Amino acid sequence: MAKAKGNREKIKLVSSANTGHFYTTEKNKRNMPEKMEIKKFDPVIRQHVMYKEAKIK
């Protein structure tokens, strides 16, 4: 039997400091339909900055 497709989708979190740094993660699109924004560490500038969701190409 085929397994049901899950609700989790892979996303990319891109730094708002325009350093080109990004994290990849998953989110449940049913529980969190809006775009994710989270404060994380950017090792390029060595500061905590906002990361915004983008699609993985």
UniProtKB/Swiss-Prot annotation:
GO molecular function term, any single one: structural constituent of ribosome
InterPro entries: Ribosomal_bL33, Ribosomal_bL33_CS, Ribosomal_bL33_sf, Ribosomal_zn-bd
Keywords: Ribonucleoprotein, Ribosomal protein
Any GO BP annotation: translation
Pfam family, one: Ribosomal_L33
Listed GO CC annotations: cytosolic large ribosomal subunit
Residue spans crossing the bilayer: none
This protein's record includes keyword Ribonucleoprotein: yes
Keyword Ribonucleoprotein among UniProt keywords: yes
Domain of life: Bacteria
Family membership: Belongs to the bacterial ribosomal protein bL33 family.
The protein's name: Large ribosomal subunit protein bL33
UniProt organism field: Shewanella pealeana (strain ATCC 700345 / ANG-SQ1)
Gene name of the record: rpmG
